[in-house]
């Protein structure tokens, strides 16, 4: 090594371009350079996960996080899934149901490992309606133990979440819904 220079490290084209933007202050202001770094790199550099904006405050929409849920139900075939989907929408237990065909489920049942082709239903509803939705699905579903699980929606497109609430509003006032 002559002249006291550090050894050169060769980097791929994308990496060297990224580093040139990050380390050359004359090219970009500091905030812009930091935006170029992927969140993963920022997490690795800081040692802690990146902070998320508060769901209630990020759009100023007034949406209450968790007031809408996405429920998941598996069915043995598309015919059964469509019948249940139409019924829950007609009864206003859900605003929308997506049918995802040809999923494979592997599970233990009565001491045996089973593998079945099923249809997955993704049901959007108010969280307050999940118990009534569950009761209805259990009453019409052909499985001995129907899968009905729900996850709260923390964030999303406010007009869509508002629409889900509006479509299901009349049922949430009178929760008793029979098959």
From Swiss-Prot:
Signal peptide per UniProt: 1-32
Region (O-glycosylated at one site): 168-176
Post-translational modification: O-glycosylated.
Any single GO BP term: response to metal ion
One cellular component term from this protein's GO annotations in UniProt: mitochondrion
SUPFAM superfamilies: GlnB-like
InterPro entries named in the record: Ion_tolerance_CutA (IPR004323), N-reg_PII-like_a/b (IPR011322), N-reg_PII/ATP_PRibTrfase_C (IPR015867)
GO molecular function, one term: copper ion binding
Cited Gene3D superfamilies: 3.30.70.120
Pfam families with a match to the protein in the record: CutA1 (PF03091)
Keywords: Glycoprotein, Signal
Tissues of expression: Ubiquitous. Widely expressed in brain.
Domain of life the protein comes from: Eukaryota
Stated family: Belongs to the CutA family.
Subunit structure: Homotrimer.
Function in brief: May form part of a complex of membrane proteins attached to acetylcholinesterase (AChE).
Protein name listed in UniProt: Protein CutA
The species this protein was found in: Homo sapiens (Human)
């Amino acid at each position: 090594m002559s002249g006291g220079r550090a050894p050169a490290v060769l980097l791929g084209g994308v990496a060297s371009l990224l580093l040139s933007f990050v380390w050359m202050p004359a090219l970009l202001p500091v905030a812009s350079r930091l935006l170029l770094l992927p969140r993963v790199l920022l997490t690795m550099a800081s040692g802690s996960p990146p902070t998320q904006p508060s769901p209630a405050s990020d759009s100023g929409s007034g949406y209450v996080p968790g007031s809408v849920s996405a429920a998941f139900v598996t069915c043995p075939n598309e015919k059964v899934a469509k019948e249940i989907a139409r019924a829950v929408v007609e009864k206003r237990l859900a605003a929308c149901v997506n049918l995802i065909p040809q999923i494979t489920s592997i599970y233990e049942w009565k001491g045996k490992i089973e593998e079945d082709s099923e249809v997955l239903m993704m049901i959007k509803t108010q969280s307050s309606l999940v118990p009534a939705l569950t009761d209805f699905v259990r009453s019409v579903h052909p499985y001995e133990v129907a899968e009905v699980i729900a996850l709260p929606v923390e964030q999303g497109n406010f007009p869509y979440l508002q629409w889900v609430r509006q479509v299901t509003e009349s049922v949430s006032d009178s929760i008793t819904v029979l098959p």
